[in-house]
Amino acid sequence: MGQVFLLMPVLLVAGYLSLGAAMENQRLFNIAVNRVQHLHLLAQKMFNDFEGTLLPDERRQLNKIFLLDFCNSDSIVSPIDKHETQKSSVLKLLHISFRLIESWEYPSQTLTHTMSNNLNQNQMSEKLSNLKVGINLLIKGNQEDVPSLDDNDSQQLLPYGNYYQNLGDNDNVRRNYELLACFKKDMHKVETYLTVAKCRKSLEANCTL
């Protein structure tokens, strides 16, 4: 009986620590999701504003080209549909999100030059950098869920090439269109992955997309 009473304070402390860690994890998830939602909305606005400067025929032609082309981030292995996203582990979704955000740190310098808005290069880079730091904290805090990455997960960490800079200056309209379309596409991906990961770590019973 005495041993039981001695263990009770230890168990209570452990419980409080576990609860505190879970609350901090949710706080970080909330911040990360809010930040990527902001970036996704920003990407959508930038893309729509750019499309608004194009002629209808020009817009249709660029859309056809983009559907047949690819984004540089397509080399980062990620779930191809909602079903795969639902099956992916929290840690896998976090690693993919980190890699996608990281892949835009350099192209974002060009991204801000394509638009005449109030967002400067440093602000865009700062938004991406802050989100990357937050996702990295979440990865460290959730390492215990999956001790190590499997072979498929490790493919996401391949070096990132600067595809967008190689499109050339002779076709700036196409280059800017693809840049903005890919940025919007990737921010949507990250928003989806972080939202699913956040739900998995919460008490919500239904995390379907």
UniProtKB/Swiss-Prot annotation:
Annotated compartments: Secreted
Q: Which residues are Zn(2+)-binding? A: H38, E191
Q: What PROSITE patterns does the database record attribute to this sequence?
A: SOMATOTROPIN_1 (PS00266), SOMATOTROPIN_2 (PS00338)
For biological process, the GO terms are:
animal organ development; growth hormone receptor signaling pathway; positive regulation of growth; positive regulation of receptor signaling pathway via JAK-STAT; response to nutrient levels
Tell me the domain of life.
Eukaryota
Is Secreted one of the keywords?
yes
Please name the InterPro entries in this protein's record: 4_helix_cytokine-like_core (IPR009079), Somatotropin (IPR034975), Somatotropin/Prolactin (IPR001400), Somatotropin_CS (IPR018116)
State the UniProt keywords alphabetically: Disulfide bond, Hormone, Metal-binding, Secreted, Signal, Zinc
Please report any disulfide bonds recorded for this protein chain, giving both cysteine positions. Answer: C71-C182, C199-C207
Keyword GTP-binding carried by entry: no
Kindly report the protein's main subcellular placement as a broad class: secreted
Family membership noted in the UniProt record: Belongs to the somatotropin/prolactin family.
Task: Say what the protein does.
Answer: Growth hormone plays an important role in growth control and is involved in the regulation of several anabolic processes. Implicated as an osmoregulatory substance important for seawater adaptation.
Q: Which protein are we looking at?
A: Somatotropin
Q: What organism does the UniProt record list as the source? A: Esox lucius
